[in-house]
Curated annotation (Swiss-Prot):
Pathway: Porphyrin-containing compound metabolism; heme O biosynthesis; heme O from protoheme: step 1/1
Additional information: Carbon 2 of the heme B porphyrin ring is defined according to the Fischer nomenclature.
The EC number(s) this enzyme carries: 2.5.1.141
Lineage of source species: Archaea, Thermoproteota, Thermoprotei, Thermoproteales, Thermoproteaceae
Organism: Pyrobaculum calidifontis (strain DSM 21063 / JCM 11548 / VA1)
Keyword Nucleotide-binding among UniProt keywords: no
Protein name: Protoheme IX farnesyltransferase 2
Gene Ontology biological-process annotations: heme O biosynthetic process
Catalytic activity: heme b + (2E,6E)-farnesyl diphosphate + H2O = Fe(II)-heme o + diphosphate
Keywords assigned: Cell membrane, Heme biosynthesis, Membrane, Transferase, Transmembrane, Transmembrane helix
Length: 278
């Protein structure tokens, strides 16, 4: 059973589910706990199903990379056919439950997010262009917007602008990881930003992107009148990102860069929690 759980990438999708929750709680006039639970279930299934497809389509790449060689498909713990059927069933269930529980507009963003990650990022661009992350990053927007339109009943500019906090985080996070494992990506022939430019350019660009991401979070929270309690979460989120990014920018060492990567997920989580407290 554990290999099938691993296929869902729970350590990755929890932030996307939290983004949906934050979008819903921020946008909804009144939080309905049954609706919130439905949103979480749909988020786990749709994001997890997309992640499982990623395992299927990248099994050859995973086998070549030290970071991913122990995943279920390269190790033969799950057959390709079983993994494909599992990914299809989980994804379909997520979409059907979204349509039944959340409605057409949230389901549109569920489908767009799934399509962005599975088709645009994984199948189309992952092996072709370093722009893969930028094009597939809409999956982050879609996660937030699924919850937002579910709570508000419509799409508006505040929701769109807030969704880009997740979008900006995605390339900064993934490129930081790819920098750490850049030799893995080169060996597998995957063109990530950190493998197609020199190391100095990669360090400077990714560090500055992290800084921009943190400042954008702060800007959003001030712009949309966050609850004062939320600043208890936003301040360390921004401060942590600025500190680790500046450290990586100055030291330009693998260790400093890894600390920046490790800080990025908690920083986004703190920002999303601040929105929940709005």
């Amino acid at each position: 059973m554990k290999p099938y759980l691993v296929l869902l990438k729970p350590r990755v999708i929890w932030l996307l589910v939290l983004a949906s929750v934050a979008g819903y709680v921020y946008a909804a006039p009144v939080v309905d706990w049954g609706s919130l639970l439905a949103l979480v279930v749909v988020g786990v299934l749709s994001s997890g199903g997309a992640a499982a497809f990623n395992h299927v389509f990248e099994r050859d790449i995973d086998a070549l990379m030290s970071r991913t060689a122990a995943r279920p498909l390269p190790r033969g713990l799950v057959s390709v056919g079983a993994a494909f059927a599992y990914a299809s069933a989980v994804s379909a269930l997520g979409v059907l439950l979204s349509l039944a529980w959340l409605g057409p507009l949230p389901t549109l963003f569920v489908v767009l997010g799934w399509f962005s990650y599975v088709v645009v990022y994984t199948v189309w661009l992952k092996r072709r262009s370093w722009l893969n992350v930028l094009a597939g990053g809409f999956a982050g927007n879609a996660s937030f917007l699924t919850g937002y339109v579910f709570g508000r009943g419509t799409l508006d500019w505040p929701g769109v602008l807030m969704s880009f906090a997740v979008y900006l985080w995605i390339p900064a996070h993934i490129w930081s990881l790819a920098y750490r494992y850049r030799e893995d990506y080169r060996r597998a022939g995957v063109p990530m930003f950190s493998t197609v430019v020199d190391q100095r350019t990669a360090v400077v660009a990714i560090s500055l992107l992290n800084i921009a991401s943190a400042l954008y979070m702060a800007f959003l929270y001030v712009l949309f009148g966050g609850d004062p309690l939320g600043y208890v979460f936003v301040a360390p989120a921004v401060g942590l990102t600025l500190y680790t990014s500046a450290l990586a920018l100055v030291k330009k060492s693998d260790d400093a860069f890894w600390k920046m990567f490790k800080a990025s997920s908690p920083a986004l989580a703190l920002f999303l929690i601040a929105l929940v407290l709005h």
